[in-house]
Amino acid sequence: MGVRLRVWPAAPHSISRCPRPLGAVLSILLAGGSRKGTPTARCLGQRTKEKRVGGRSLRSEAGSGPCPTAGAQPTAPSSAWPPRLRPRTCPQMSGELPRVRPTRVGLSSLGSGPGHPPSGTRMCGERARNRRGRARRLTPEQPRIGASAGPGPPLPPARPRCSGSCHLPRPPQHLSPPQPGRVRMGAAEGSRRADTHHARRRRRARLPAPRSAST
């Protein structure tokens, strides 16, 4: 069974560094190769590595865009393919001109370094400054409600609840001893008390039941 060998012309990227005639290479291949330590084996190993690297470079260029001819350079250095992408960094940190005009607060914070945020803002992860049950500190522009309000009328003292079934409020009792000139007024007040609705109901309950006309 014969073995057919096909030889392609050497490409410019696959030219080995150690020049060997084509006949010597074919004789080495037909003879079954040589040892790894010989210079011919080294040249063959370098040649296969260069072929692999050249094939990868050609594939990457073919996938990325139009591939110029071997050994040819682009006409202008600025029109290199593919174009270089700039890193996505903050324009303030990289020194480039920002696309959006920053506010005055932002410029002041950039100039002064890590400063405090403006009043009224709450940072992420920050707890509430005022907990429940604690009074907030008043600003000098915020007046106190108690100081601005005028003195109102005095509140009447709370009357104690009477014990028992009486639901009507009792008149205030005089703690001072009774005077002789006010005895008649007290009797008049007693007669008025007896004429209340509650007293009338009590009287009706005490009276005997009316007899029926049939008896």
Curated annotation (Swiss-Prot):
Signal peptide: none annotated. GO terms for biological process: apoptotic process; negative regulation of proteasomal ubiquitin-dependent protein catabolic process; positive regulation of apoptotic process; regulation of protein stability. The keyword Secreted does not apply. Widely expressed. Induction: Up-regulated after serum withdrawal. Its main location: nucleus. Residues 185-215 are annotated as: Necessary for nucleolar localization. Residues 169-180 have a biased composition (Pro residues). Residues 35-215 are annotated as: Disordered. One of its GO terms (cellular component) is nucleolus. Apoptosis-inducing protein that modulates the tumor suppressor function of CDKN2A/p14ARF. Enhances the stability of CDKN2A/p14ARF protein by protecting it from degradation. May act as a tumor suppressor. This is Proapoptotic nucleolar protein 1. It comes from Homo sapiens. The gene is PANO1.
